[in-house]
């Protein structure tokens, strides 16, 4: 072997060794990443005493409201625990469109997570806990930053029922102003005192607006609370359009609202099944 040939051979061998080492490092990283992914996807233990159908309702409700633009990266859907009325169910801090059944956690009414396991929770969980404390009849709470509703939360124009689907609004829609009792804040319901004040303004109504923030809709089921959150946004947009036409809109009376809302309860499954069909395929992605 000549000196020149030996030098070339040594250089090629060194290059091949470096490539092999890099390949080995890449393989090791991939294997480690695979182990990490497997650990991250470990199934969460089922919540005690909670039917899978209720978890699905929370998931479908979260995703359909995001799909309709009532929710975006913010907002949340909760349900009172079916066997422990002093607890409620709500997802970890996550964009509503991404919520799965495994993301749903259990909280007491003070907003303490029963089994956090390092998962981040929503700051505004106090909205839900304090309303469940104040309203034993409420089994579900939805908080949104509904674009249609915001103008009515900051103006003197009251939100009123325009047609039969949002007929529940005919009972009156109070507006909670955080600044009235708490001064200048970050506008978020980040503690029990704020949540209690909001719940007091909601009183016995199905919907309360939050000045410069959004709204809260409640109901005896997740389906009805989601229905109310959706149609509150629809009503707000239609009312803005009607006002823009000029003159005073012909709103539903309290009596019309009460009778029409009874029909909503009778047909809720019709629209819910449509929404469910629309959302369930996204859960496989």
Q: Which positions does each model-derived feature cover?
A:
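N-terminal secretory signal peptides that target proteins for export/translocation
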Residues: 1-18
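Bacterial N-terminal signal peptides
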Residues: 12, 21-33
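Intrinsically disordered, low-complexity regulatory segments enriched
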Residues: 14, 24, 277-280
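Sec/Tat signal peptide C-region and signal peptidase I cleavage site
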Residues: 35-39
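Glycine-rich flexible loops
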Residues: 41-285
């Amino acid at each position: 072997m000549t000196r020149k040939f030996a030098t070339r051979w040594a250089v090629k061998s060194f290059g091949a060794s470096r490539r092999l080492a890099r390949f080995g490092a890449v393989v090791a990283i991939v294997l480690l990443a695979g182990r990490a992914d497997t650990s991250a996807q470990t199934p969460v233990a089922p919540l005690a005493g909670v039917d899978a159908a209720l978890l699905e309702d929370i998931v479908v409700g979260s995703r359909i409201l995001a799909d309709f633009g009532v929710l975006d990266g913010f907002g949340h859907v909760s349900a009172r625990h079916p066997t422990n009325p002093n607890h409620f169910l709500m997802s970890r801090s996550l964009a509503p469109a991404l919520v799965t059944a495994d993301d749903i956690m259990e909280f007491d009414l003070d907003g303490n997570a029963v089994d956090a396991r390092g998962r981040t929770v929503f700051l505004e969980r106090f909205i839900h806990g304090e309303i469940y404390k104040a309203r034993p009849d409420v089994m579900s709470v939805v908080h949104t930053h509904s674009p249609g509703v915001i103008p009515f939360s900051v103006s003197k124009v009251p939100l009123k029922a325009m047609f039969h689907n949002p007929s529940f609004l005919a009972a009156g829609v109070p507006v909670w102003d955080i600044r009235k009792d708490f001064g200048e804040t970050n506008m978020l319901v980040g503690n029990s005192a704020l949540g209690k004040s909001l719940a007091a303004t909601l009183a016995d109504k199905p919907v309360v607006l939050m000045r410069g923030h959004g709204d809260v809709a409640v109901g005896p089921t997740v389906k009805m609370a989601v229905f109310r959150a959706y149609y509150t946004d629809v009503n707000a947009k239609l009312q803005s359009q009607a006002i823009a036409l000029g003159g005073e809109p012909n709103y539903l009376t309290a009596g019309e609202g009460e009778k029409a809302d009874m029909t909503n309860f009778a047909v809720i499954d019709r629209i819910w099944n449509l929404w469910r069909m629309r959302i369930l395929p996204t859960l496989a992605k």
